Amino acid sequence: MVTKEEDCLPPVTETTSRCYSTSSSTPLAELETVRSLEIVESSSSLSPVWLLVIFCIINLLNYMDRGAIASNGVNGSTRSCNDKGKCTLATGIQGHFNLSNFEDGVLSSSFMVGLLIASPIFASLAKRLIGVGLTVWTIAVLGCGSSFAFWFIVLCRMFVGVGEASFISLAAPFIDDNAPQEQKAAWLGLFYMCIPSGVALGYVYGGYVGKHFSWRYAFWGEAVLMAPFAVLGFLMKPLQLKGSETLKNNNRLQVDNEIEHDQFEVSIETSKSSYANAVFKSFTGFAKDMKVLYKEKVFVVNVLGYVSYNFVIGAYSYWGPKAGYNIYKMKNADMIFGAVTIICGIVGTLSGGFILDRVTATIPNAFKLLSGATFLGAVFCFTAFTLKSLYGFIALFALGELLVFATQAPVNYVCLHCVKPSLRPLSMAISTVAIHIFGDVPSSPLVGIVQDHINSWRKTTLILTSILFLAAAIWFIGKINLNSFYSNDESFLVQIKLFVANLCFCKGYS
């Protein structure tokens, strides 16, 4: 059940809150939370505004990496010849390793493996692991630039995902906790604006560096840019999320904490039976939290719509420049897609957060914005790919992207506010896992398979874009049946799943 955020805020003079559940944290997570809260008070800390800026820059660099590897300058193409015998040289990663479109799509999705595995771990354990994760990211990106075989670059991309997971599950809950009440959606919009902006910047960056130097230099440059933030991850004070004080006072786990000369030591019983018991409690606690999330109907429907949405956006971000180059013979596809995406991404994402704040940020209003913006965006994007005129395509596609990107703040607002504060990091982690494992992880290889089969980028993009209508339909169901989600009729969730399954089945035969 959704609780009002005001009801979840603990009184100033109290140490506990009636909305925080200690059962939602596992013993191992509690232990690390205690460690985080016991850091010496003199350790350096940053204001929420500065942390928002840092998170935005890190997010920007993460998605710039995705845009760079998708750019024609870095991704490249295989050697091809036309009917007249005129051949084009092999370029970029695809040309260097002679990859098919399917293998190229696998390269796009491989980093998600690390992200999916590591996100719940980072969400449950140490708040200080941001520094470790960003260090892994930096080393992995260096490895991408130094790759000597296809399997090696795929492995490095997996570790890039591990690095990204270090902050992605913690950043949004922290921003929501610390943003002014009337600007929560706007702050989230600013953070998620970095997703399309980063991808667009990656298109331009990768296209320029790949063309003038080598695709390898694009990765090495990213590592240099991220290195200072990896160091900062070790130096800044650990994040403290809502519910931390409750854990501090009520869940010591019989740990004796001592602070001597600015050093923190934890003494715990090390017997095998105690360790096994702690691990067992960790897994049972995690299972209980997952059961709570699964029963939260708003969360389930929101994520189902987000999965469909991300399936399209993930494939757009990777195949967009190549599709545009082949359909409209764009000479500067990286620059054009980059410019359109960065402008529409910034304006659309910020507008979505601003509009949600203006109409009052609530879950019903968020669902209205999600379904309406996604449907109209799908109409414009679908129509754009039917046009033969390059300028007509750019105009309509820009309008479509503007509307589609307006969903970033609302969809994450729902993820954060449909559960109690203590479950927000896990909610964001599971949402991230779901939208990737069912969304953009399979979409890039599947689009590659479709393109290899029908050999028409226009038809491929039209098939892909049509899935946005499914996302709009799911979010619309969430809006019109919101009251039913909070009723005791458990069969309603089954009805929703059957509707989505039938819709997907019918779509497969349309």
Swiss-Prot record:
Keyword entries, A-Z: Glycoprotein, Lipid transport, Membrane, Mitochondrion, Mitochondrion inner membrane, Transmembrane, Transmembrane helix, Transport
Annotated GO biological process: lipid transport
Keyword Membrane among record annotations: yes
KW Mitochondrion (keyword) present: yes
Bilayer-spanning residue ranges: 44-64, 106-126, 136-156, 158-178, 185-205, 219-239, 298-318, 336-356, 369-387, 392-414, 430-450, 462-482
Glycosylation (residues): 75, 98
Membrane topology: Multi-pass membrane protein
Compartments it resides in: Mitochondrion inner membrane
GO cellular component term of the entry, any: mitochondrial inner membrane
Gene3D superfamilies cross-referenced by the UniProt entry: MFS general substrate transporter like domains
A Pfam match: MFS_1
Matching InterPro entries: MFS (IPR011701), MFS_dom (IPR020846), MFS_spinster-like (IPR044770), MFS_trans_sf (IPR036259)
GO molecular function: transmembrane transporter activity
Similarity comment: family membership: Belongs to the major facilitator superfamily. Spinster (TC 2.A.1.49) family.
Role description: Probable sphingolipid transporter.
Protein name: Probable sphingolipid transporter spinster homolog 3
Record organism: Arabidopsis thaliana (Mouse-ear cress)
